[in-house]
Swiss-Prot record:
Record protein name field: Biogenesis of lysosome-related organelles complex 1 subunit BLI1
Name of the gene: BLI1
Keyword Cell inner membrane: no
GO CC list: endosome
Role according to the record: Component of the biogenesis of lysosome-related organelles complex-1 (BLOC-1) involved in endosomal cargo sorting.
Organism lineage: Eukaryota, Fungi, Dikarya, Ascomycota, Saccharomycotina
Domain of life: Eukaryota
């Protein structure tokens, strides 16, 4: 019975050792892959840094201010365009009214002239 127990314990220990070796190998592979990926990502990050230089905060702030200035100028131009479009519409309306008044005046004169000729 003791021999069976000892054999069983030895078998269990061998299983544990095999399992531990398997886990150690798997962990080592995972750590190696992770390390390689990390290294690749660091290299890629450095390439990106060189390729796309990040502007400092002062320069970014200057760009934002310039953008806002241009937006304000654009808004001012749009309001001027709106004003001139309305003015043009009013002038066209005024011109139409003047044409109507001129025709009415012409009709009055022609009637007046025809009345004075009689």
């Amino acid at each position: 019975m003791r021999d069976q127990e000892r054999t069983l314990n030895q078998d269990v220990e061998r299983c544990i050792n095999v399992l531990q070796d398997f886990l150690d190998t798997g962990s080592a592979k995972a750590i190696s892959v992770f390390s390689n990926k990390t290294s690749e990502n660091e290299d890629w990050l450095e390439e990106i840094r060189v390729k796309y230089r990040i502007k400092d905060n002062d320069e970014l702030q200057a760009i934002k201010m310039l953008k806002q200035k241009r937006l304000d100028q654009l808004e001012a131009l749009e309001s001027k365009v709106d004003y001139y479009e309305k003015l043009c519409d009013e002038l066209e309306e005024f011109q139409d009214e003047m044409e109507v008044k001129a025709k009415l005046e012409q009709n009055r004169r022609s009637r007046f002239d025809s009345m004075t000729r009689k």
